[in-house]
């Protein structure tokens, strides 16, 4: 993060408890800038908040985005209260501005928001033990089940065609043809990897068109590090980063969780010998996910869960490679060839999944 901000003047527009003391940058995620605001309460206690600058270059209508988050978290809170849970820890809680809004728009046209900090819980960039993935699966399954009676029509489509893999492929081919930075000649193998799987990009899109898959309220970005894990119990307690909550497929959420969770390395690991799809981790997540929400899904949704894991991993790799070809304009990079490294990493996982697809299917059907 190259730019510095006057955090105190920004945060003072929100209804915070205590006196603002310090702020720390929180370097995590590819899209928004995130910071931790530390306040001191009346009795000297530490109160933390999460401050974020919404990336309005990507999220073209932050007002609609925040309305989605507000509606979804309000619905989830009601469910948590019905279940005698803790609504302050089990979902995101928006801190309103002094004008009663869910965001603050400063004079530089930046959009800022604040959430309560969830204490006693952590996120993990990589799975440290299989039990974490089982409990993450339970948390995501619970998230989908809690929203199963939410009216999808109430949600804005904040990023149209976000997981439309057919259109993603068309955009990828456009990037190859334009070759803005002259990089295509050096990544022919990776480009061919994508082209050889073009038919895969049509499968779920066609099923939606044929009304074979129901649209649900979905998270659409269920990386493992978007699940808060309780530090004491090891249970998955909350699903966070709700910017892409909109109508979608349950398959998207399952698939992206496997992409980020059932791997032996970070998504930008350069040494591909360290990057492997872990079938045991896949099974732990599938077990938790289906235990929590399996009875809410249709036969076709269940059948295509394994394929969705491969497709979401493929889509992510394709997007990384497209961004590399376009000159690294979407995902934040921290080194040369960062997006290319990410793409190769994801394609290695896709290859592994293709070899394990029969076993992946057997695992799903063993838990329904």
Task: State each model region's role.
Residues 17-22, 183, 296-305:
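Short, surface-exposed acidic
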Residues 1-24:
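Juxta-kinase regulatory segment immediately upstream of eukaryotic protein kinase catalytic domains
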Residues 229-294, 334-339:
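Active-site Asp-x-Gly
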Residues 38-41, 229-231:
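Short, low-complexity Ser/Thr-rich regulatory SLiMs
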